[in-house]
Amino acid sequence: GYDRAEILRRLRFVSPSSSFRAGYSYSNFGLTEGAVAAAKPTGKPWEEVAEEKLYRPLGMASTSSRHSDFIKHANRAELHAKIDGAWAAKVQRYPDAQAPAGGVSSTARDLSQWMRLVLGNGAYAGKTLIKADALDQTHIPLMVRGKNPVSGGEAFYGLGWNVEFGRHGPIWGHAGAFSAGARSLVMLFPEEKLGIVVIANAFPTGVPEGLSDSFADLVFDGTLGKDKVKAWNDIYAGMFGPVIAAAKATYAAPPSPASPAAPASAYAGRYFNDFFGDAIVSGEGDALVLKVGPAAARSYSLKHFDRDLFLTFPDAEMPDRPSAVSFAVGPDGKASAVTIDFLNDNHLGTLQRVGD
């Protein structure tokens, strides 16, 4: 719920996953920080610079980095996530804070013009929009990523691009997703001046990778090989299905006998850390409620599991996946800290009590 400036300020509290350019970690706000820095000398926001320098010169009239522009289109795709085995449009996503990395709305036609720019080494319709040597720097393999799990090609990361060397030659590409229900993928073959982009309003799905790999097989081999859509769908199912199943199994039933919770007053209070700010725990009726974000905007009901451990279900796109919220209760009978598992990916999910 925080705005872009506040999120970027708080990134200082996240420990780097590697030394500079020694490893790759997917980071929408890392890329956003770079975009903000690039736009700063112009005195204009990134959204305006992107429109002036990129979208407008390429004739991308249906492309914007503003969510408000996307909403204005009557003909737009709603995000879909698989819930109880069926695709459903349940979640609204407001990505403006990370617009440079994950907030662009577009069409297949518009994105084809962008691919022409990249494959043209920064030139489009006879005009140079990006210097070729600057664009070349982004395609240099800098970090090793291993092998592509389907094609077996050697995979690396450059500056905002996956760089792969497979049986069809060098490939520049990238994929992205929102678990709320969005997928995107681009795959470029620079030696053939050929590319494909796939945008999908669904998650999780390996269809974008499967389609692009099948496209490459048809172009280079004249025939389809193995079912690439199934191969990639299986990979995505393996990435997320077991995680959900493990969480459900862990908390399928409390231990027997379960220890009762302390009185609500033991847990109620205000908790804080530098990264997430305030979290408020309060008793509402017979239940505890956790509120986080600016002005305590997001609220999560807590269901008792065992002693000082509670469960909540924070994901609208995975409503049956439980997540733990645990309290550290001291000799005085008061919780001194709370650990919120769904905020703990960077080991920053523990907040200390700072008030009642």
Language-model segment annotations:
Residues G1-S184:
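Short, surface-exposed loop or secondary-structure junction motifs
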Residues M60, G120, Y124, N201-T205, ...:
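Short, well-ordered loop/turn and helix-capping segments at boundaries between secondary-structure elements
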Residues H80, W161-V163, V186-L188, I280-V281, ...:
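A structural signal for short hydrophobic beta-strand segments in well-ordered beta-sheet cores
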Residues I83-D84, F165-R167, F189-E192, E284-A287:
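Short acidic-glycine loop/turn motifs at beta-strand connectors
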Residues L119, H168, A177-S179, N201-P204, ...:
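Short, glycine-/Ser/Thr-/acidic-enriched flexible segments
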Residues P149-S151, V197-I199, F203-D217:
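Extracytoplasmic and endomembrane cell-envelope/extracellular-matrix remodeling and assembly machinery
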Residues H174, S184-N201, A337-I340:
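Short, well-ordered beta-strand elements
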Residues E209-D356:
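Peripheral terminal and inter-domain segments
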